[in-house]
A protein has these predicted regions:
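Positively charged n-region of N-terminal signal peptides that target proteins for export
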Residues: 1-6
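Hydrophobic h-region of N-terminal signal peptides that target proteins for export
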Residues: 8-17
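Catalytic-loop region of hydrolases
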Residues: 17-84, 102
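N-terminal cap/lid subdomain of alpha/beta-hydrolase-fold enzymes
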Residues: 57-164
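Catalytic cysteine-centered active loop of the rhodanese-like fold, especially the PTP/DSP P-loop
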Residues: 86, 191-192
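Conserved acidic catalytic loop of the alpha/beta-hydrolase fold
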Residues: 146-149, 156, 171-191
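Mobile cap/lid helix-loop segments that gate and shape the active-site cleft of serine hydrolases
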Residues: 164, 168-171
């Protein structure tokens, strides 16, 4: 039994000593379908990282997001007029996971009426998803999920006050949302 402890400790050391970095501005898109109120809904799922920029235009954080857009009969003009729900958890330290797979996303966890998982474990279509009437972006604030602060050219992180606190959250998340809408809906940036 004592050897198992040491093996676990050694493996943990090697896993934690690896430097893992995510690209600060990247995305992956897939296409899916679901049924809501008896109607087939085609939608696009996009996961990615999008930077938070400072006053000088340098990235100071990168936020992980999941973005769902309806595809059925949606023109570019309709997309600009379609409601966008921005969802993130209240934290501190809690990502958007539970809103995502708990109630508004196109897929939800298989759970019973009391909230316990049922077998076979996994996810199922969410007949109450709002993707039929609004697009949804689930955002993980800094230090939740994969979202992180970014070191500057000197290897230093930005001041924590920029990200942790009510006013800081309002400022940087508001800026991030403006950039997101500008990129995804207004189409102001290339390769979005």
């Amino acid at each position: 039994m004592n050897n198992i402890y040491w093996y676990f400790l050694l493996i943990s050391f090697f896993v934690n000593s690896q430097k893992i970095e995510f690209p600060i501005d990247t995305l992956v898109r897939t296409v899916h379908e679901t049924a809501i109120n008896g109607k087939k809904i085609n939608y696009q799922a996009e996961v990615g990282m999008q930077p938070v920029w400072d006053e000088d235009g340098l990235p100071i954080a990168s936020l992980f997001y999941t973005y769902y857009t309806r595809l059925n009969n949606i023109s570019k003009n309709d997309l600009k007029n379609r409601p966008l729900i921005v969802s993130f958890n209240g934290g501190p330290g809690s990502g958007s996971l539970w809103m995502h797979i708990g109630y508004t996303g196109p897929k939800i966890l298989k759970i019973d009426k009391e909230g316990f998982p049922i077998q076979p474990y996994g996810v199922k279509e969410n007949p109450f998803s709002i993707i039929d009437v609004a697009d949804i972006v689930f955002v993980n604030p800094v230090n939740t999920g994969f979202s992180r602060m970014i070191k500057n050219k000197d290897g230093e992180y930005p001041d924590r006050e920029k990200f942790f606190g009510i006013n800081a959250d309002i400022k940087y998340l508001g800026s991030w949302i403006n950039s997101f809408v500008s990129r995804k809906i207004d189409g102001n940036l290339p390769n979005t």
